[in-house]
Amino acid sequence: MAVLPPDPVFTLRCPEMGAVNSLCFHQNERLLAGTIKGSVFLWDLQTNRSLLHFAIGKEPITTLHHTEDMLISQEKGGAVTLWTLGNSGYKRHFTINANYVGYCRSVLHANTNADDDHLLFYPCEENSIGVLHLNDVENPSQILVPDDAQLPKLGTLTCFKPFECASQLFVLAGYESGHFLTWDLSSGMVVDVLQMDADPMCLDYDPLANRGIVGGPCK
């Protein structure tokens, strides 16, 4: 007999919220929920009440991240927006129109080689990766474009994972074709190509154990 899951400790409900598409915590006492209607709801986990909500756009919110004082949202369609937190709520600070229509989610990475620097990795165009330093958003993003003629046909970018090895920063990226490219951020070059099953949907990698896992539509 299957073991039933435990009952929730509490349930957060709001008639205006609707279906939730993404979640992230802020300082362990607040939960932000991005909805398919394009809004963000901020919940206080001490009172279980929604402190505020605001509209980002009309597209579903696919990903949310939060630093100490900044919210990052990614919408279906690729728009990535940075929001600053003030006394009156969140204010739009910077928007990147990444022009990406797939399901790959952005990733926030704490740069251990520089204090107080977070790197935002986001999908852009069909198969490129943008890299933005959050402490200097006015500078153009670094764009990793797989335009080497020797590379196989990749299709759409579907997932990626930044990781550090020997004090160097790399990105392992999966594509529709099932190819996985390892990018060296210092040079912006591909240093390894691996062929696996087509249509990877998510991945994780532990550089210490040198082990990774890939999830797809069938397994």
Report residues per predicted region.
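A short helix->beta-strand "capping" segment at the edge of beta-propeller domains
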Residues: M1-M17, T47
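Beta-strand-rich domains and repeat architectures in extracellular enzymes and scaffolds
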Residues: T11-G38
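Surface loop/turn motifs at the tips and blade-to-blade linkers of beta-strand repeat domains
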Residues: L12-P15, F54-I56, T95-N99, V145-P152, ...
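Canonical WD40 repeat/beta-propeller blade segments in eukaryotic WD-repeat proteins
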Residues: M17-F25, E59-H65, Y100-N111, Q150-E164, ...
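Conserved beta-strand element within WD40/beta-propeller blades
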Residues: L31-T35, L71-E75, L119-C124, V171-G174, ...
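Loop/turn residues immediately N-terminal
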Residues: K37-S39, D69, G78-V80, N127-S128, ...
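WD40-repeat beta-propellers
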Residues: V40-D44, V80-L85, I129-N135, F180-D184
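Asp-box/WD-like beta-propeller blade repeats and closely related beta-sheet repeat scaffolds
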Residues: N87-L119, P123-G130, N135-A149
